[in-house]
Amino acid sequence: MPIDRNNVTNAGNNQLILSNTVASGTNRSILDLSEFSDAELAGYRLRCGVWITFVLATGFVIAAKFSFGHETTYTDKGKKPVGGKFLSFDHVKFWVGNAKQAASFYCARMGFEPFGYRGLETGSRHIVAHAVKQDQIIFVFESAYEPGNEEMGNHLSQHGDGVRDIAFKVEDIDTIVRVAKQKGAKIIKDIWEEKDEFGIIRLATLQTYGDTHHTLIDRSKYEGFFLPGFVKASEDILIKHLPAIHLKFIDHIVGNQADKQMEPVAKWYEECLQFHRFWSVDDTQLHTQYSSLRSIVMTNWEETVKMPINEPAPGKKRSQIQEYVEYYGDAGVQHIALNTNNIITSIQNLRKRGMEFLDVPDNYYDMLKNRLNSSKVKIIEDLKILQELKILIDYDENGYLLQIFTKNMQDRPTLFIEVIQRHNHNGFGAGNFQALFEAIELEQAKRGNL
């Protein structure tokens, strides 16, 4: 039986559930390992503590998730969108108590630079906005000028500082909005235009999970540096005295949901934005003795925008996802992953700037080295330096990724930042989830929230 894409789930009693994806769907069958002798189980390899490859005497090869449960990489994109195209993340908008200070923090600590400004001096009488940029990454921090701004005031009271809007750069915005309307999406603001001497920009805003929005931006007729109404920001003389970080672009943005809300949200992206499922894991894999989660990664047809959707699963104690939802007051953005092509230099310099990261015990690297000894994958970075910096490593037969997570970016235990480098690896660090969970649980315990 040829294998296109398979998953094997540990069913207990020395049995594995084999799921074989074929054109017509997914076939599942029970494989009882007790039926095979040691000779028939001619060989196996352990990768990342997750994948085991069995080579049977018949030549049948099974790449199995033996210990941790069900992970799926989707090869079928489904039906091609009827029109419209998502090009990339455009920018991320934060609603915060003090936009100037928040922007300054991300510049001083994370390596961003002042990029754009919109405020009283530019004719914006109610909202101030400070935009910061690092390569292709743009964050915009907004605050209210006046005490009577009920919408922003309620948002800050409920959520604290957090992501209000994940903006996408798109083509054919008319079709995207038309399909979203047909599928029942809540349109916060229908298509409108803004213009200045550099051209016209077309926008529309949709409601996604919680109080989070997606603004669609068509820049095809605009040549300005950012958005109409913004002027270029003044230089921060502190920047030239600090080490460069070299973060390149937004890799993915993760949204946390309340229990049993992951599937409805994933369905919303499938129907309203014509996204498809790219990758998923369940709570049999992503767990510790205390807590667990489930995750589905949604992406556009071109797979340039990736949006993981998480939900908590029942556990002995409060999971990191549940803690987030309780402190944020609803579903919202848990973390933003920023891609770099030199994570060692990036993290060394971030630490010099005073950024704090989740700790990883040394035994993680001891076990990693043992697994790498039996793997074909070769890590080109110095493992000693990766260990010193507490950078996590995940890999499969095709390549590997390096990742690290900051501590929370504000007092509430909500948003944090991930720094990631990919070497021919399109996953999301499933092999590191246990180490990550345990590191987060240590922080939860310090807060009295575990």
Enumerate the language-model features and the residues they cover.
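Core segments of cupin and vicinal oxygen chelate
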Residues: 44, 87, 93-138, 182, ...
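An N-terminus-focused feature that recognizes amino-terminal "leader" regions
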Residues: 66-220, 225-231, 259
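N-terminal beta-strand motif that seeds the catalytic metal site of vicinal oxygen chelate
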Residues: 68-100, 163-166, 223-266, 329-339, ...
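C-terminal functional regions that serve as terminal interaction/effector modules
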Residues: 83, 96, 335-450
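Short, structured motif recognition centered on aromatic/hydrophobic residues
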Residues: 89-95, 112, 132, 139-141, ...
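A cross-kingdom feature marking solvent-exposed beta-strand/loop segments within repeated
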Residues: 116-128, 145-165, 170, 174, ...
